[in-house]
A protein has these predicted regions:
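N-terminal transmembrane-helix/juxtamembrane module of multi-pass inner/ER membrane proteins
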Residues: 1-76, 120, 130, 268-289
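Membrane-interfacial, low-structure loops and terminal tails that flank and connect transmembrane helices
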Residues: 1-18, 211-229
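Alpha-helical transmembrane segments
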Residues: 23-34, 172-175, 233-239
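Membrane-interface loops
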Residues: 39-58, 83-167, 171, 177-178, ...
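Cys-dependent protein tyrosine phosphatase-like superfamily
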Residues: 59, 65, 70, 218-290
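Membrane-embedded alpha-helical segments of multi-pass membrane proteins
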Residues: 68-76, 145-150, 193-197
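Alpha-helical transmembrane segments and their membrane-interface exit regions
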Residues: 177, 196-207, 260-273
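Helix-loop-helix junctions and helix-breaking kinks within/between transmembrane helices
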Residues: 179-195
Length: 290
């Protein structure tokens, strides 16, 4: 195990890390169920809730046992908070969780979508897990997939800490979790890229180390930088408008949300945030999210 789990350099007593993680979990878990349930309730009160389904999705098989990896993200959600070497690490991971949950719930409320596939009856452990899931989850709260957003965050958190055989096993299990949102018929395809975008945004907003991209922001007085900021901001607005309007005709237009966010971040950099938004380290490498 020593060769498979990267050593964690403790910078403070681990007991403090556990307490901090427990406090965050005591807040995040109820917040999730309350806000997620509220969004579900609002959607259920609508006369009609739309859906985005590609024709080829009807060929996706229902694989009952994949509810197990689907559910496993709940375990890793809590364990990840404990897998930190200081309170700052806990705070940053919690910040990513909170970002994903808040943004996703806002989207669920403003743009509710519903899953259209009806699952067949299941028995045994899968049947039990589906029954528990159905006890609080409804066929709404689709895009962006909060499950995928949290998976991106949790996958990134563990991949920096595992070594040896555990690392490819982790990648494989993470793939199963990601695929399970389709094979359990919990989500439609478009929920995945939108959820991944949200997850990477949360990673960027709260990086593992270094300054936060929004810390110390001051509007620049440089005329050229302001002009460039406006130029990139305009590009972001146009891409966002293209995604919103294009989605009325073809859901593929929602992929424009990726360049829209990228352009917005560059505009933010020129406006005063500076080069730290690119999260480049001393050796020239950059974070996955940036």
């Amino acid at each position: 195990m020593a060769s498979s789990l990267a050593p964690i350099a403790r910078t403070e007593p681990y007991g403090r890390v556990v307490v901090r993680a427990a406090l965050w979990l005591a807040f995040l878990a109820p917040f999730f169920y309350l806000s997620y349930g509220f969004a579900n309730w609002l959607a259920s009160r609508r006369d009609e809730v739309g859906s985005i389904v590609f024709s080829w999705e009807h060929s996706i098989p229902f694989v009952a046992w994949t509810i197990v990896p689907y559910w496993s993200i709940n375990l890793f959600y809590g364990l990840s908070l404990l897998l930190n070497n200081d309170k700052q690490g806990v705070d940053r991971l919690a910040g990513r969780y909170l970002t994903a949950q808040v943004v996703a719930v806002i989207c669920f409320i403003l743009f509710p979508l519903t899953a259209t596939f009806v699952r067949p009856a299941t028995t045994g452990l899968p049947g039990f897990l589906f029954a528990v899931l159905g006890g609080f989850d409804k066929p709404f709260n689709q895009a962006p997939s909060l499950h995928i957003a949290l998976l991106v965050i949790i996958w990134d958190h563990w991949r920096h800490r595992l070594r040896g055989l555990l690392l490819p096993l982790w990648h494989g299990w993470s793939f199963l979790i990601g695929a399970s949102v389709l094979t359990t018929w919990q989500h439609h395809f478009i929920d995945i890229p939108t959820g991944a975008l949200l997850g990477f945004f949360a990673l960027w907003l709260f990086p593992r180390s270094g300054a936060l991209p929004f810390s110390g922001f001051r509007l620049t007085s440089d005329v050229k930088a302001r002009r460039l900021a406006r130029f990139y901001a305009l590009g972001a607005v146009l891409a966002l408008a293209g995604a919103a309007l294009g989605a009325l005709f073809c859901a593929v237009a929602l992929f424009l949300l990726w360049p829209a966010l990228a352009l917005a971040i560059v505009a933010f950099a020129y406006a005063g945030a500076g080069e730290k938004v690119f999260q480049k380290s001393a050796d020239g490498s950059i974070t996955l999210a940036s």
